Amino acid sequence: MPGICGPNHYEATSSLHGTNDAPLFEGEAYGNPATCTVGSELAPGTYRVTLLFAEIYWGDGCPGGGGVGSRVFDVVLEGATVLSDFDILAASGGCLASTTSEAGAPIAKTFDVAVTDGAIDIQLPASVDNGKLSALEVRGPL
């Protein structure tokens, strides 16, 4: 099913550790807010949405430096906030693109979402820096 995320995109400049699925996490859509729209003619129903996150910019040994609290955002699916004040670095333990540390791991968060308008709308508004998303998976209708 087609989709688009943005408004901005970033690619890691060093190889990633902590995952066997590095291609899923080497890039990200980011912004304030970052947004994604998945599908345009989805049948009404409940869909299982898995959002994949990995910090590749902020943290020890990464391009942005900084640390916990450098990126904090909410996750809103179809108008409902499903995660508040999410800090990938705090949740994952480190930056996957770090050149000085092997700490950190990707994070997957799964939610069931009711779709009535033909598309799954995702917003990632930030209170610090930018919201971001590495990848996503949609299954359904369930």
Task: Give the role of each language-model region.
Residues 1-142:
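Compositionally biased, intrinsically disordered or flexible polar/acidic segments
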